């Protein structure tokens, strides 16, 4: 990141920041994408089992990685304010937190996964695959969480191309392992959805190893000497980190868990409905990588400018990110409307699943506009380190409005499973509106402070 003087320079720098993040997020999502699509071609039961396992794993992993994402705005502001010497201590303390969080998640999972799955009244093969999926994916928790911290450091320096290269190097490993283990090729046993979990866990370890090697040997990362000194754990540092990270993590958890909750509540419907819902939701999540990547770029750009006390520049980056998100939303809506048949065919050859997935995809169109506003706005707010209000707004939008309304529509109207999608759409729209209002308030506050000073 560097200081810019014109809107065109900001737009160019933002795009150069965003594009590698986008490729990275798409590559990381591709692991889940290939898990789902390749499991679906193994059998509808494997697809449903992976869907249930993923619906439990994703909210937990994204919520906790969200806490660790506090690394990015903290480091970005330190770099913007010329306090490079403080960065190694922040990163090492965050790594300690990541490892501790990993063991806590694994311990909790040992006692909760089986009761949760038993209470869902799933078909026995689906429950078995989901349980095995979750048991095996736990092997990848430590490297995933640790990598999240190190990636936050790399991205905060504006070197998003590096994380892109790391992920692109790792993706082929995941695809090959999926091909070998899901379908039983090259003499390996045919494991179905369970093979997808093994592939993902192994890939997480590969990503961490590559990242550590780059930080130790390549500039500008090596000049920070991140691993030169293993600082003693500092509870005060953990407290400061968590003060920012916990609201970020819970906001992400509330958003991702609402979709997982819908998938779990759909366990009362048929395996066909679960599989179709998962296929449509998986593709909608694929499109979500764009506003998510824009949000991550906004956190870096806004955080850097706020650290340097250039508040008008931070405001302009906010407008750039939201404008690009809305443009992509229009493009994706057209894609979903005209190519729903082709999209559904990616996930399944089962006629019933294919037909129902097409119906769900139409609702995904309505997700696009709300996501294009809410997600980048949250990224900008994180750059300002303004996270508490966003947490409350997200909780209300998704869990007080979206899910209860979806349940009512699914249970007491003819919309059935589609009622959940309608509830989510209304909740997302509410959240987007109020998050945008909050961003305007924060921008006005900082701009006013700048004028007075």
Curated annotation (Swiss-Prot):
Subcellular localization: Cell membrane
Identification of the protein by name: Probable multidrug resistance protein NorM
Topology term for the membrane: Multi-pass membrane protein
Signal sequence, start to end: none
A molecular-function term among this protein's GO annotations: xenobiotic transmembrane transporter activity
Transmembrane as UniProt keyword: yes
GO CC list: plasma membrane
Family assignment from sequence similarity: Belongs to the multi antimicrobial extrusion (MATE) (TC 2.A.66.1) family.
Source species, domain of life: Bacteria
UniProt KW keywords: Antiport, Cell membrane, Ion transport, Membrane, Transmembrane, Transmembrane helix, Transport
Species of origin: Bacillus anthracis
Keyword Disulfide bond part of the UniProt annotation: no
Transmembrane region(s): 13-34, 49-71, 92-114, 129-151, 164-183, 193-215, 244-266, 286-308, 317-339, 359-381, 388-410, 420-442
GO biological process: monoatomic ion transport
Cited Pfam families: MatE
PANTHER family per record: FMN_FAD EXPORTER YEEO-RELATED, MULTIDRUG RESISTANCE PROTEIN NORM-RELATED
């Amino acid at each position: 990141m560097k200081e810019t003087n014109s809107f065109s320079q900001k737009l160019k720098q933002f795009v150069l920041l965003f594009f590698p993040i986008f490729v990275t997020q798409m590559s990381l999502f591709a692991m889940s994408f290939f898990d789902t699509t390749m499991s679906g071609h193994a059998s509808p039961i494997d697809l449903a089992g992976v869907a249930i396992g993923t619906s439990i794993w994703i909210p937990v992993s994204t919520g906790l990685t969200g806490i660790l994402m506090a690394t990015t705005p903290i480091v970005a502001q330190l770099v913007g304010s010329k306090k490079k010497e403080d960065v190694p201590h922040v990163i090492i303390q965050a790594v300690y937190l990541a490892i501790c969080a990993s063991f806590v998640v694994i311990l909790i999972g040992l006692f909760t996964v089986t009761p949760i799955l038993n209470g869902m009244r799933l078909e026995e093969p689906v429950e078995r695959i989901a349980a095995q999926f979750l048991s095996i994916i736990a092997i990848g928790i430590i490297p995933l969480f640790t990598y999240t911290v190190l990636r936050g450091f790399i991205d905060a320096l504006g070197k998003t191309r590096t994380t892109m290269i790391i992920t692109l190097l790792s993706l082929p490993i995941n695809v090959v392992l999926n091909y070998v283990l899901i379908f039983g090729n090259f003499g390996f046993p045919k494991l179905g959805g369970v093979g997808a979990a093994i592939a993902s866990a192994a890939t997480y370890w590969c990503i961490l190893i590559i990242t550590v090697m780059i930080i130790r040997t390549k500039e500008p990362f090596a000049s920070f000497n991140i691993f030169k000194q293993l600082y003693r754990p500092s509870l005060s540092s953990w407290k400061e980190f968590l003060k920012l990270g916990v609201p970020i993590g819970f906001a992400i958890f509330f958003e991702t868990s609402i979709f997982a909750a819908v998938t779990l509540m759909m366990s009362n419907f048929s395996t066909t409905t679960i599989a179709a819902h998962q296929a449509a939701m998986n593709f909608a999540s694929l499109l979500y990588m764009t506003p998510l990547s824009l949000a991550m770029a906004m956190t870096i750009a806004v955080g850097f400018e706020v650290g340097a006390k250039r508040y008008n520049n931070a405001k302009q980056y906010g407008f750039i990110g939201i404008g690009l998100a809305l443009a992509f939303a229009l493009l994706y809506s057209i894609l979903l409307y005209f190519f729903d048949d082709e999209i559904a065919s990616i996930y399944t050859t089962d006629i019933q699943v294919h037909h129902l997935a097409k119906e769900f995809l139409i609702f995904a169109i309505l997700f696009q506009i709300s996501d294009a506003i809410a997600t980048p706005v949250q990224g900008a707010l994180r750059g300002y380190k303004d996270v508490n209000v966003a947490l409350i707004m997200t909780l209300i939008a998704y869990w007080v409005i979206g899910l209860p309304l979806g349940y009512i529509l699914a249970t007491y109207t003819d919309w059935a499973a589609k009622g959940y999608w309608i509830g989510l759409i209304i909740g997302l729209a509410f959240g987007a509106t109020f998050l945008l209002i909050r961003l305007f308030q924060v921008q006005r506050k900082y701009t006013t402070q700048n004028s007075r000073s």
